[in-house]
Amino acid sequence: MHRIEQTQYGYKLVFEGFLQKQDLSTLLDDMKQTIRSRGRKFPVLLDMRHSRAFPADAQEIFKEAIRFFKQVGMERNAVVLNSAIATLQARRLGKETGIDATSRYIDASTEQEWEKVALAWLERAVDPDVH
């Protein structure tokens, strides 16, 4: 399951469960209908705390979704995870799509104030890897 929310700062995507290729295809379609260029850059919060790593065939669609976000103006993003495997996969996908410099990965299992940390990065560019 997934959810896309427009927020004051940009967009929030929430993933839950084990997402298959079809789930991500639906997500991509939803993104293309929901997310529009705002005429300026915007940040994205990706909440994957209740999700698991993507199967290989779904990863290509996820990369396409990342490229779409870049195309319509994504500036920074924060990815919140609970799984070491999902974190490794997210970092790899970030590198493969060229967003690794503007992505921050937050481990919600060790960071109780994960949302506060994520929003500090998204709204004010306070780097959680430095502070």
What are these regions (language model features)?
Residues 1-131:
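Amphipathic, Lys/Arg-enriched alpha-helical "gate/interface" segment within cytosolic domains
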